[in-house]
Regions:
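Short beta-strand-loop-alpha-helix junction that forms the active-site gateway
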Residues: 129-134
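Structural signal for conserved beta-strand scaffold positions within catalytic alpha/beta enzyme cores
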Residues: 102, 127, 159-161
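Active-site beta-strand-loop-beta-strand hairpin of nuclease catalytic cores
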Residues: 115-126
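Surface-exposed interaction regions that form or flank ligand-binding interfaces
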Residues: 2-99, 139-141, 148-155, 162-201
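Active-site metal-binding core of divalent-cation-utilizing nuclease and nuclease-like domains
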Residues: 97-115
Length: 201
């Protein structure tokens, strides 16, 4: 039972699904530790064999610091952001006729903007972030601009920091989708979801 539990914990979580950010942080922490241990092992081996730091393995160890440092930057960048709360996931799951994406960390040249959830349905995009540091106008404009560049047309793109307001908007989207009984723009919604994933760390 314990073995199966550990295997379940290490099971790959796809980008855009609940739990991805926490999973990705664990993977990158493990990868970073392994990289630095390998660098240390290579350097130590070279020093033990030659009794000097001026050897080929030292050069290899120095070069190995580059991917190790890159992995460390990934850990540091993602570390402040946690996966979406399961309570929100449970509430949004009540809108099964919509397209959903979770655990986003959207980036521009100047900003890093965490977004817990985005719901897409029939020409409308609603998103939620609990970070008060995120400028909602900047975030909405960035997503609209990216959609325009990718020839995706939406009448409404809006993000919220108010949990209850966001849920009420999602409830409204679900009601409309249920009445229509089908996704009018299913392919475009899938493309929009993929765009958001591409824009996210």
């Amino acid at each position: 039972l314990e073995k199966s539990r550990r295997e379940e914990q290490m099971k790959r979580i796809e980008k855009g699904t609940p739990g991805y950010l926490d999973y990705k942080k664990k993977v990158e922490i493990i990868r970073t530790v392994i990289y630095f241990l390998l660098v240390a092992a290579i350097f130590t081996l070279g020093y033990v064999q030659t009794k000097t730091r001026s050897n080929l393995l030292t050069v290899v160890a120095i070069l190995g610091c580059l991917p190790a440092a890159k992995a460390l930057v990934g850990v540091i960048t993602r570390f402040p952001y946690a996966s979406v709360d399961q309570k929100l996931v449970h509430e949004v799951t009540k809108a099964p006729h919509t397209t959903r994406v979770y655990d986003l960390v959207l980036t521009t040249r100047e900003k890093i903007m965490p977004v817990e959830c985005v719901v897409i349905s029939n020409g409308t995009v609603f998103g939620y972030t609990d970070s008060k540091k995120v400028d909602l106008n900047v975030l909405s404009k960035h997503i609209r601009d990216m959609m325009t560049q990718n020839r995706l047309s939406y009448s409404t793109v809006k993000f919220y920091q108010d949990y209850k307001v966001f849920l009420s908007r999602i409830e409204g989207l679900e009601s409309i989708a249920m009445v229509e009984n089908a996704k009018i723009n299913g392919e475009e919604e899938a493309q929009t979801r993929q765009l958001l994933l591409n824009l996210s760390m």
